Amino acid sequence: MSITAERKQELLKEFATANADTGSPEVQVALLTERIKNLTEHFKEHQKDNHSRRGLLKLVSQRRRLLDYVKRKDEARYQALIEKLGLRR
């Protein structure tokens, strides 16, 4: 259910702006998106897991705040990020 270390490294390489970049909003959004996808798969099998559903809503809200921040700072980076991640907005 959690992200493997290999997958996390792939995401870091793909979205990092610098070599050792782990804290940029793009990387954070990519990691949150991966966790949200994993939880969404979990809910296909465990529909009544309300405890994890609350965690999912928390992750979605956190991702939304980070995306709003990126959009406020640089619209082009925001558009590139949502295009790369395949998000709807």
UniProtKB/Swiss-Prot annotation:
InterPro entries: Ribosomal_uS15 (IPR000589), Ribosomal_uS15_bac-type (IPR005290), uS15_NS1_RNA-bd_sf (IPR009068). It comes from the Bacteria. GO terms for cellular component: cytosolic small ribosomal subunit. Keywords: Ribonucleoprotein, Ribosomal protein, RNA-binding, rRNA-binding. SUPFAM superfamilies: S15/NS1 RNA-binding domain. GO terms for molecular function: rRNA binding; structural constituent of ribosome. Pfam families: Ribosomal_S15. One of its GO terms (biological process) is translation. Part of the 30S ribosomal subunit. Forms a bridge to the 50S subunit in the 70S ribosome, contacting the 23S rRNA. PANTHER family: RIBOSOMAL PROTEIN S15, BACTERIAL AND ORGANELLAR, SMALL RIBOSOMAL SUBUNIT PROTEIN US15M. One of the primary rRNA binding proteins, it binds directly to 16S rRNA where it helps nucleate assembly of the platform of the 30S subunit by binding and bridging several RNA helices of the 16S rRNA. Belongs to the universal ribosomal protein uS15 family. This is Small ribosomal subunit protein uS15. It comes from Chelativorans sp. (strain BNC1).
